[in-house]
């Protein structure tokens, strides 16, 4: 690590009332894990005094942050059981297990999909702008399982990232929910980080500067009593989008207690699986469609409830 750099900011009127950890995270673009370490080390001061992360900032206050620049390096992890769904000269589609992060949030961290990619495919470290991302073109929540795409070259990574930004990637999820739910529908509700709960998002008030567009489409595949197995296609890629959108229409995901979902102690996770990805290959331009099999614990939960697990290839949905 290099010597710390002092960053100072004055709280503007439109940021008054925001938690100081969210304020710092927004202006410096830091992960929650790194913010936690900064506050534990007393590296964040408000008007010269060490601040706790829950402090609400006021207009005109001076916020100072001592920040060490972290070394960005890819750490190979050969012990991670990487499952490759598809491999070619440009792309890798891998099956992420629940409980594993997509990529590291701090220097030296291992145990993530990105670490496993770099161990098996070293060229992935140079494909993404940040070598710690191991060529990954997107990410999934820690407790979400399913298909991820990574690039083996910078050109492929740039092309696939652009496709995500242009909504040219077909992203399908399977979720088990409870609550009344129409057979199908669209959810077009912008989201933002919750101002007092940094580990979740919420519907953004109209006109909010930090609002991010979020559009999802759902279709019920099976029902059993109050349970519904739903396929969700997302057209944007906001943090926790599927979880927050389904909870927002009164159908939270089973096991997702952060968003009001019913507890599922026997499951050990929430029921959300990235079922399929479809995109145009960056080199051949041919359409690709890669699916991830439903994990055994999710299949067992469906069987317990008398629901049928769907086939691996989802039916096409209109882009609308």
Residue ranges and their predicted role:
Residues 1-320:
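RNA pseudouridine synthases
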């Amino acid at each position: 690590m290099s010597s710390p750099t002092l960053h100072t900011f004055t709280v503007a009127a439109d940021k008054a009332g925001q938690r100081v950890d969210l304020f710092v995270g927004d202006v410096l673009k830091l992960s929650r894990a790194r913010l936690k370490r900064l506050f534990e080390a007393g590296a964040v001061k408000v008007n010269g005094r060490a601040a706790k992360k829950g402090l609400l900032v006021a207009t005109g206050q001076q916020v100072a942050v001592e920040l060490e620049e972290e070394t960005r390096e890819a750490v190979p992890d050969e012990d991670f059981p990487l499952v490759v769904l598809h491999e070619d000269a440009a792309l890798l589609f891998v099956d992420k297990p629940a409980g594993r992060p997509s990529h590291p949030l701090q220097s030296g961290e291992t145990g993530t999909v990105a670490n496993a990619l770099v161990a098996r495919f070293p060229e992935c470290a140079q494909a993404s702008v940040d070598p710690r991302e191991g060529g990954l073109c997107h990410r999934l929540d820690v407790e979400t399982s399913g298909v991820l795409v990574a690039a083996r070259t910078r050109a492929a990574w740039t092309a696939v990232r652009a496709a995500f930004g242009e909504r040219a990637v077909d992203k399908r999820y399977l979720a088990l929910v409870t609550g009344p739910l129409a057979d199908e529908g669209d959810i077009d509700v912008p989201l933002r980080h919750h101002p007092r709960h940094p580990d979740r998002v919420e519907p953004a008030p109209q006109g909010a500067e930090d609002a991010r567009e979020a559009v999802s489409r759902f279709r019920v595949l099976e029902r059993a009593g109050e349970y519904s197995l739903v396929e969700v296609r997302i057209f944007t890629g906001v943090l926790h989008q599927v979880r927050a959108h389904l909870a927002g229409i009164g159908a939270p995901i089973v096991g997702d207690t952060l968003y009001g979902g019913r507890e599922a102690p026997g499951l050990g996770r929430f029921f959300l699986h990235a079922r399929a990805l479809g995109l145009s290959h960056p080199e051949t331009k041919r359409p690709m469609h890669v699916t991830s099999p439903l994990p055994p614990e999710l299949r067992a939960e469906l069987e317990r409830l008398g629901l049928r697990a769907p086939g691996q290839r989802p039916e096409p949905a209109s882009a609308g």
